[in-house]
């Protein structure tokens, strides 16, 4: 039982490390989008920042922050 719990904890920690260190570009639904940081970081906290017309959004599935593929906020 303790071994199973230990393996589960290690798996969760490694999954979080992977999500935080995910590459800057990712393909979702066949579209290439630019990720912004990852983990708890928001787009404006660090490079790469979203272009001014694209909103920073959080992925529902992975929790990673990324630039929206839809243009909005344009003046």
From Swiss-Prot:
<keyword id="KW-0964">Secreted</keyword>
<feature type="propeptide">
    <location>
        <begin position="20"/>
        <end position="31"/>
    </location>
</feature>
<protein>
    <recommendedName>
        <fullName>U14-hexatoxin-Mg1a</fullName>
    </recommendedName>
</protein>
<keyword id="KW-1015">Disulfide bond</keyword>
<feature type="signal peptide">
    <location>
        <begin position="1"/>
        <end position="19"/>
    </location>
</feature>
<comment type="function">
    <text>No toxicity is observed upon intracranial injection into mice and intrathorax injection into crickets.</text>
</comment>
<dbReference type="GO" id="GO:0005576">
    <property type="term" value="C:extracellular region"/>
</dbReference>
<keyword id="KW-0732">Signal</keyword>
């Amino acid at each position: 039982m303790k071994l199973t719990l230990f393996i589960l904890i290690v798996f969760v920690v490694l999954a979080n490390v992977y999500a935080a260190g995910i590459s800057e570009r990712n393909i979702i639904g066949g579209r290439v989008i630019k990720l912004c940081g990852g983990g708890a970081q928001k787009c404006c906290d660090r490079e790469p920042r979203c272009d001014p017309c694209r909103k920073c959004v959080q992925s529902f599935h992975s929790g990673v922050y990324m630039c929206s593929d839809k243009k909005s906020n344009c003046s």
